[in-house]
Amino acid sequence: AMADAGVKYGLTKQQALTLAAQAVAGSAEMVLSCGEHPEKLKDNVCSPGGTTIAAVCDLEKNGFRGIVQSAVCACVAKADEMSK
């Protein structure tokens, strides 16, 4: 989805995939390396009135947390089903 948005705004598919992967990898590395809760990290990287907080607000408005939790629950349920 992130890469598709990049293409929408003029990046090539490869550029968009690379940037999206780097963003995800960078976020994961930050969580793994510093030991801070992701909420604290979010607070650290979001500037007042900035682009990141605008994106975070949009994710929250559109139910991102619930969508991710639902997907994890579906994965666990399917894994349980497959293990029987």
Model-derived segments and their meaning:
Residues 1-18:
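Anionic-ligand binding region
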Residues 17-84:
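NAD(P)-dependent Rossmann-like dehydrogenase/reductase catalytic/cofactor-binding core
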